[in-house]
Amino acid sequence: DKTDITMQIHDIQTEFTPICGFSIKSELGNAPTLINATRATNFIYEVKSFRGTLQDVNQIETSSKIKDRLTKIEELGGQLEFYKCENDVFNDNLRKADSLMPEYLAEILLKYYKGQGRYLRDLVDDEIKTIRVKDFLKAILLGMFSGTPWDGAYTCNGLVVVRKDGDLLLYHVIKDMEL
């Protein structure tokens, strides 16, 4: 269950007053995570056409070693192709959000680690992918866990974000599961 707090919402226009569960993410202190990086969330890539050695890549120990190792692989003719998610449950959950979600996220991860952007708006340049990734993020925020089979249901109705300045933002989806 993604619910951290339960609140009653009062809609003054409809007089609708549901009791809803919300997840809480705080920007105070460390940046909040949407999904925990674990073995369940690993993406596996296959290196094709590589003309170097494993040592050529693994000897790189710079402060930006992932980016530098990816650059070295490409310099030596290598191309990284998404192979699979390490965890089958995570893969299945991603495909429930969209049948191509593992491939979309694999592409986004590569772009991020190559230094091609830090924000989704910089890493996703296709309108359809943008919409699908937002749907995935909603699923992660409201119901999906990486290592547990997901049935498509949301276990909370929204998100409370505590901003760095202490302001609160409330995002809610009240009747989404009734569609």
Task: List each language-model region with its residue ranges.
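Short, positively charged
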Residues: 1-2, 8-179
